Amino acid sequence: MISAVAGDNFLGGEDFTTVLEQMFLREHEIDEDTLDQKTRAHIHKQAEICKLGFADAKTSVMKCNINGEVVESEIDIDDYEKSCQVLLGRIRKPIERSLKDANIKLKDIEEVILVGGSTKLSIVRRFVSRLFGRLPNTSINPDEVVAVGAATQAAMKERNEAVKEIILTDVCPFTLGTEVVSRR
């Protein structure tokens, strides 16, 4: 049973990539407005590669070719985490809101399962560990669990025999509004 739903629909992996882009541009004193679209796309791709490099390392390198010159930064995970504090704070708010809505205390949570691609980031996992006071369950692929959930929901909508025993009870995650039209 789902007791509460909360989230930030405007927060995701791209936001964490953008932080790396901004760190790189700042370090090399590059004005983003002076870059052409191709160079911006190249920097973005290299920031994404750099972000993925943190999966198994404390530092990651971002190397970009800008106007024929190779510009390189070695970024430390702790510096990256400090630069992501605003984003991590945005993760905290929906967690706190859903716990409050469900009337659940942090100490009552038995297990934390991370869902979605951004939860593979070590800084997100560390943040969640500190918030909940325990390590999250990492035995489930956070991308696959989304796909399995979507497939299960689709099978339920199609009334597939394989999922006939599954019942999903949800809260309404959206605010409801009413419009009144007067013809006077």
Identify the meaning behind each predicted range:
Residues 1-184:
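Oxyanion-binding/catalytic loops of NTP- or PPi-dependent enzymes
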